[in-house]
């Protein structure tokens, strides 16, 4: 039954056109930079991030993969980004250059789009604009380098990575599905908070000693 539902949802888009409008959205990365696409129901894709924490100058491996393999690959394109704040998952909130950057692990199937007007984003698969006959894939893997700004060091306890994925190669009619990673803890932030608590405790003890001599 589960495989049958997946087949109807993913592999028979023509039925949507006959019995009702398909939930389609933007096709170009520039559009996704400014507005989140309308998302179809279904958890057919997931994000795996290794390791499960981050710190400055230590990259993360981000893998986007499909959860169903019975009918072959179903990743035509993917738009992956790290939201501006940990609690904000909107692509429209992007725009700060200090939010890290992407480096493709395999340039043949995961290229960075130079046409993007927003930062900290990557356009998946193998082109900025898809062709109707492009090859579908089971997964995409990229490398994300964490930010190095002081704000991220002392203000950002964690981040999440968000992906919008489409199984439709045809850019004229695309459905989008959303995948979100688990919170990725910021070790620099944790260490900074620890040092701040220790510093405040030392200052409190120092003031107590001064009061004893006065």
From Swiss-Prot:
Primary location: secreted
GO cellular component, one term: extracellular region
Organism: Lottia gigantea (Giant owl limpet)
Record-given protein name: Uncharacterized shell protein 16
UniProt subcellular location: Secreted
Domain of life: Eukaryota
Expressed in which tissues: Component of the acid-insoluble organic matrix of calcified layers of the shell (at protein level).
Glycosylated residues (UniProt): 88, 139
Signal peptide region: 1-17
Keywords tagged on the record: Glycoprotein, Secreted, Signal
